[in-house]
């Protein structure tokens, strides 16, 4: 490579000159009198600068580690190789090493990409497989990053400079500490000042040397850095061992004094009993948050539960003695230790916390369980449970302060269950957070009514129900359950019996003149009071019968509000009486229904309009044919999608074939009473004698019009129309259907085309 190593001093030589010059620098470092001065001069200011390329940056979990660094290096090299295959190149950088730390500067722009002070660099490793690559770990706690760098030449000089940098900084700090030590020695010494100074020195050594020692003591480098630096390495290793001993002492002191070993091992039990508060604080080191579920991790059940028990032993030494008398283990582990008897007993208590201590199964006695509760609930909850186990437990403190129950779960879970049991009948049904799935069985059985009450809260009618007296919420629950059974008459009784309870407004609301008004006084009638529940459920669940009912209502827009309920009640049950009741309503509106506005939908109009038009034929006195057809039309009206049109067309054209000679005179005489206007009579008179071709063409138009009106196209009407075209009298239907199509093409053409044919042809031959 033609890349050169550049420094602020005379370091701009190729590899051949840099190789012999490196030992000279190391020889200078041997002399302790020159090392610090030379290194300070070397790293002062901008320091040393090396040309390199940035392989990549990777987040790493730890501050140091050979295996971690190697894995990260291989990962970044693989990513760089993949990028190179796509035409990407590594970023060219300058690595600047100075007293301020390591700076990564972009070669082109000169911008400082990354800057890491010395105290943030925790590990430096040279790649074993590539002598031109190295990496270092930097960053704060939890934010460690591994920077992989490919140097232009050998990476060894750069790594040596980094070691020199850390050594210089360490020596400078050490000298400063020595000066402080001398100044402190010259001053008047107080009692224990020397011990404090030694502790400070050790702490300073930790601060200064930990990074340095862990940096190079854990370095993943081969023994290339050998002869000149062995003495220094030995010194660093000695300091490292000293630091390790100090760290171990600092680590073991909290272990021994805080009694954490009592949590993990049963050996130092008396220490935990003498220092229970330290045991609890040390236990938090391993388990930062108290475990709400003591059975979540069985292997750690002992330390997890021993800590609260030892913490509770602060406030109740007498009950600690009682628990000691009831168990053969010390109080440090309490009744919650690995003893299977107390473990099983606690399990029974957790699973049977419904206020029935006698239901605890197994050979575990009741008094020992009571002592257990006393031991575990020393934080103020035992005063509630020791007397009568659940008698004094009031639900209001639990409802007011749920976090207190979560802070120390071993004691409050029992009070939680007792308060839930005592407040099961209250209107405020608060389900506590699922601390454990096992006591949930008793909770579910005890709060079945409360769960139903919460389930009914989904509807807006329940909050007013709570405003009623305390005994009332049980009644709306059964009413809501009855409403969902689909029985319309079932909820009528309870809804009427509720009186002022605002449960009925959403049901009767849709049938009031104002659709969204929730007042119950709008529908007090006997006819409507029986119907709102049956119509409420289709509206809520979006079923089609209720929608069709409201779609058909525009045809009866003029009648007053009381008649529609009587009309709509049979229509939902689809009884024959419905159409008989619609006939008196359809008669007065015959003249209006023949030419309604075209905005009416064809789906909503055919049934009421057919009923109204079918009611018109009885006006002429000799209508025997229509009387025979009325019951058949009524039954076909019940099924609008049936074969009604097929029957009408067949009968109509059957009459055509029989009555061909007398059609014209009978039609002229009977068109006025059939309910048609003068425009239709003139239209029929004009159409008499039209050639057969036009008649056939009109037949085809009428057939298309019938097919448009009837959603399911029937082949029978088409054949009937084709047979009717052979007759010369078939022109009666076709012009008539055209007339209706011109005046009202969307709605009335179907019923009007059926009845006028039936009425004029039924008179002569009936």
UniProtKB/Swiss-Prot annotation:
<keyword id="KW-0879">Wnt signaling pathway</keyword>
<feature type="modified residue" description="Phosphoserine">
    <location>
        <position position="193"/>
    </location>
</feature>
<feature type="short sequence motif" description="DPF 1">
    <location>
        <begin position="293"/>
        <end position="295"/>
    </location>
</feature>
<feature type="region of interest" description="Sufficient for interaction with GRB2">
    <location>
        <begin position="600"/>
        <end position="730"/>
    </location>
</feature>
<feature type="modified residue" description="Phosphoserine">
    <location>
        <position position="401"/>
    </location>
</feature>
<keyword id="KW-0813">Transport</keyword>
<feature type="region of interest" description="Required for localization to clathrin-coated pits">
    <location>
        <begin position="230"/>
        <end position="447"/>
    </location>
</feature>
<dbReference type="GO" id="GO:0045785">
    <property type="term" value="P:positive regulation of cell adhesion"/>
</dbReference>
<dbReference type="GO" id="GO:0030132">
    <property type="term" value="C:clathrin coat of coated pit"/>
</dbReference>
<keyword id="KW-0221">Differentiation</keyword>
<keyword id="KW-0963">Cytoplasm</keyword>
<dbReference type="GO" id="GO:0032968">
    <property type="term" value="P:positive regulation of transcription elongation by RNA polymerase II"/>
</dbReference>
<feature type="compositionally biased region" description="Low complexity">
    <location>
        <begin position="600"/>
        <end position="612"/>
    </location>
</feature>
<dbReference type="GO" id="GO:0043066">
    <property type="term" value="P:negative regulation of apoptotic process"/>
</dbReference>
<feature type="region of interest" description="Disordered">
    <location>
        <begin position="699"/>
        <end position="766"/>
    </location>
</feature>
<dbReference type="GO" id="GO:0046330">
    <property type="term" value="P:positive regulation of JNK cascade"/>
</dbReference>
<dbReference type="GO" id="GO:1900026">
    <property type="term" value="P:positive regulation of substrate adhesion-dependent cell spreading"/>
</dbReference>
<feature type="short sequence motif" description="DPF 2">
    <location>
        <begin position="298"/>
        <end position="300"/>
    </location>
</feature>
<keyword id="KW-0053">Apoptosis</keyword>
<dbReference type="Pfam" id="PF21792">
    <property type="entry name" value="DAB2_SBM"/>
</dbReference>
<feature type="region of interest" description="Disordered">
    <location>
        <begin position="596"/>
        <end position="630"/>
    </location>
</feature>
<dbReference type="GO" id="GO:0005886">
    <property type="term" value="C:plasma membrane"/>
</dbReference>
<dbReference type="GO" id="GO:1903077">
    <property type="term" value="P:negative regulation of protein localization to plasma membrane"/>
</dbReference>
<dbReference type="GO" id="GO:0006897">
    <property type="term" value="P:endocytosis"/>
</dbReference>
<dbReference type="GO" id="GO:0030335">
    <property type="term" value="P:positive regulation of cell migration"/>
</dbReference>
<feature type="compositionally biased region" description="Polar residues">
    <location>
        <begin position="367"/>
        <end position="381"/>
    </location>
</feature>
<feature type="compositionally biased region" description="Polar residues">
    <location>
        <begin position="1"/>
        <end position="16"/>
    </location>
</feature>
<dbReference type="GO" id="GO:0001921">
    <property type="term" value="P:positive regulation of receptor recycling"/>
</dbReference>
<feature type="modified residue" description="Phosphoserine">
    <location>
        <position position="727"/>
    </location>
</feature>
<feature type="domain" description="PID">
    <location>
        <begin position="45"/>
        <end position="196"/>
    </location>
</feature>
<keyword id="KW-0968">Cytoplasmic vesicle</keyword>
<feature type="modified residue" description="Phosphotyrosine">
    <location>
        <position position="170"/>
    </location>
</feature>
<dbReference type="GO" id="GO:2001237">
    <property type="term" value="P:negative regulation of extrinsic apoptotic signaling pathway"/>
</dbReference>
<keyword id="KW-0597">Phosphoprotein</keyword>
<keyword id="KW-0653">Protein transport</keyword>
<dbReference type="GO" id="GO:0005546">
    <property type="term" value="F:phosphatidylinositol-4,5-bisphosphate binding"/>
</dbReference>
<dbReference type="GO" id="GO:0038024">
    <property type="term" value="F:cargo receptor activity"/>
</dbReference>
<feature type="region of interest" description="Required for interaction with MYO6">
    <location>
        <begin position="647"/>
        <end position="766"/>
    </location>
</feature>
<feature type="compositionally biased region" description="Polar residues">
    <location>
        <begin position="467"/>
        <end position="480"/>
    </location>
</feature>
<dbReference type="GO" id="GO:0030276">
    <property type="term" value="F:clathrin binding"/>
</dbReference>
<feature type="compositionally biased region" description="Polar residues">
    <location>
        <begin position="727"/>
        <end position="753"/>
    </location>
</feature>
<dbReference type="InterPro" id="IPR006020">
    <property type="entry name" value="PTB/PI_dom"/>
</dbReference>
């Amino acid at each position: 490579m033609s890349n050169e190593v550049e420094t602020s001093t005379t370091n701009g030589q190729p590899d051949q000159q840099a190789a012999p010059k490196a030992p000279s620098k190391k020889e200078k470092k041997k002399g302790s009198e020159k090392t610090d001065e030379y290194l300070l001069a070397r790293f002062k200011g901008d320091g040393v600068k090396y040309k390199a390329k940035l392989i990549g940056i990777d987040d790493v979990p730890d501050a140091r580690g050979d295996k971690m660094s190697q894995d990260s290096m291989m990962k970044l090299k693989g990513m760089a190789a993949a990028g190179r295959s796509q035409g990407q190149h590594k970023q060219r950088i300058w690595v600047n090493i100075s007293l301020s730390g390591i700076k990564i500067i972009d070669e082109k722009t000169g911008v400082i990409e990354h800057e890491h002070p010395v105290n943030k660099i925790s590990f430096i490793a040279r790649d074993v497989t590539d002598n031109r690559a190295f990496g270092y770990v930097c960053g704060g706690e939890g934010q460690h990053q591994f920077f992989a760098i490919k140097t232009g030449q050998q990476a060894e000089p750069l790594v040596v400079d980094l070691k020199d940098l850390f050594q210089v900084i360490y020596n400078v700090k050490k000298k400063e500490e020595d000066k402080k030590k001398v100044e402190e020695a010259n001053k008047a010494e107080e009692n224990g000042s020397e011990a404090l100074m030694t502790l400070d020195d050790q702490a300073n050594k930790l601060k200064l040397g930990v990074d340095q020692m862990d940096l190079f003591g854990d370095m993943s480098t081969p023994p290339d850095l050998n002869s000149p630096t062995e003495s220094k390495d030995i010194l660093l290793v000695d300091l490292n061992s000293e630091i390790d001993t100090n760290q171990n002492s600092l680590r073991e002191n909290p272990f021994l004094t805080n009694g954490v070993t009592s949590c993990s091992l049963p050996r130092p039990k008396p220490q935990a009993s003498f220092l229970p508060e330290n045991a609890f604080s040390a236990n938090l080191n391993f388990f930062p948050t108290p475990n709400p579920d003591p059975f979540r991790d069985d292997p750690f059940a002992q330390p997890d539960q021993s800590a609260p028990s030892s913490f509770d032993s602060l406030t109740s030494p007498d009950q600690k003695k009682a628990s000691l008398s009831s168990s053969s283990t010390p109080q440090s582990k309490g009744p919650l230790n690995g003893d299977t008897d107390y473990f099983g007993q606690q399990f029974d208590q957790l699973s049977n916390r419904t206020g029935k201590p006698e239901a605890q199964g197994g050979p575990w006695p009741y008094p020992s369980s009571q002592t257990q509760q006393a031991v575990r609930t020393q934080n103020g909850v035992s005063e509630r449970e020791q007397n009568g186990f659940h008698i004094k437990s009031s639900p209001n403190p639990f409802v007011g302060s749920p976090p207190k129950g979560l802070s120390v779960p071993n004691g409050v879970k029992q009070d939680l269950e007792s308060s839930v049991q005592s407040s099961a009948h209250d209107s405020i049904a608060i389900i506590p957070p699922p601390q454990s799935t096992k006591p949930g069985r008793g909770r579910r059985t005890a709060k079945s009514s409360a769960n139903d009450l919460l389930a009914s809260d989904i509807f807006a009618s329940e909050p007013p129900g709570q405003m009623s007296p305390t005994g009332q919420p049980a009644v709306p629950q059964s009413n809501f359950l009855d409403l969902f059974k689909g029985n319309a008459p079932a909820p009528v009784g309870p809804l009427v019996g509720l009186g002022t309870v605002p449960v009925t407004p959403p049901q009767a609301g849709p049938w009031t003149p104002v659709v969204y008004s929730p007042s119950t006084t709008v529908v007090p009638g006997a006819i409507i009071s029986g119907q709102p529940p049956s119509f409420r459920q289709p509206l809520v669940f979006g079923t089609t019968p209720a929608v069709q009912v409201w779609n058909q209502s525009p045809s009866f827009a003029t009648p007053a509000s009381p008649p529609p309920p009587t009309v709509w009640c049979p229509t939902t049950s689809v009884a024959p009486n419905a159409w008989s009741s619609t006939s008196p309503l359809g008669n007065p509106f015959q003249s209006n229904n023949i030419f309604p506005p075209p905005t009416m939908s064809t789906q909503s109009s055919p049934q009421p309009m057919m009923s109204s038009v079918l009611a018109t034929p009885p006006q002429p006195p000799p209508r025997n044919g229509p009387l025979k057809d009325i019951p058949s039309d009524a039954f076909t009206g019940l099924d609008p999608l049936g074969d009604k049109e097929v029957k009408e067309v067949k009968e109509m054209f059957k009459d055509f074939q029989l009555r061909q000679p007398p059609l014209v005179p009978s039609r002229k005489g009977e068109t006025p009473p059939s309910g048609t206007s003068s425009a239709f009579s003139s239209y029929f008179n004009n159409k008499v004698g039209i050639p057969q071709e036009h008649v056939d063409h009109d037949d085809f138009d009428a057939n298309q019009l019938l097919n448009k009106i009837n959603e399911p196209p029937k082949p029978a009407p088409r054949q009937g129309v084709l047979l009717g075209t052979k007759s010369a009298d078939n022109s009666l239907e076709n012009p008539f259907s055209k007339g209706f199509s011109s005046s009202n093409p969307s709605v009335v053409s179907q019923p009007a085309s059926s009845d006028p044919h039936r009425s004029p042809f039924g008179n002569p031959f009936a």
